Amino acid sequence: MAKGIRDKIKLVSSAGTGHFYTTTKNKRTMPEKLEMKKFDPVVRQHVMYKEAKIK
């Protein structure tokens, strides 16, 4: 079987709470690291989430 072109990634909160989201990303069309603003339920506000590898 062929290896898929989508990688599993983890989006970690920049607020330092340890909260994270998991998602997939197409590594061929988006080689740069993903950053997006999402809701952090620990601090109850929208903060920047940055891409990290899933261990």
Curated annotation (Swiss-Prot):
Does the entry feature the keyword Transcription, yes or no? no
What family does the database annotate?
Belongs to the bacterial ribosomal protein bL33 family.
Q: Which species is this UniProt entry from?
A: Photorhabdus laumondii subsp. laumondii (strain DSM 15139 / CIP 105565 / TT01)
Instruction: Return the NCBIfam families for the record.
Output: PRK00595.1, rpmG_bact
GO CC terms, sorted: cytosolic large ribosomal subunit
Q: Which Pfam families match?
A: Ribosomal_L33
GO molecular function terms attached to this record: structural constituent of ribosome
Q: Which keywords does UniProt give here?
A: Ribonucleoprotein, Ribosomal protein
Q: For this entry, list what GO says about its biological process.
A: translation
Designated name of the protein: Large ribosomal subunit protein bL33
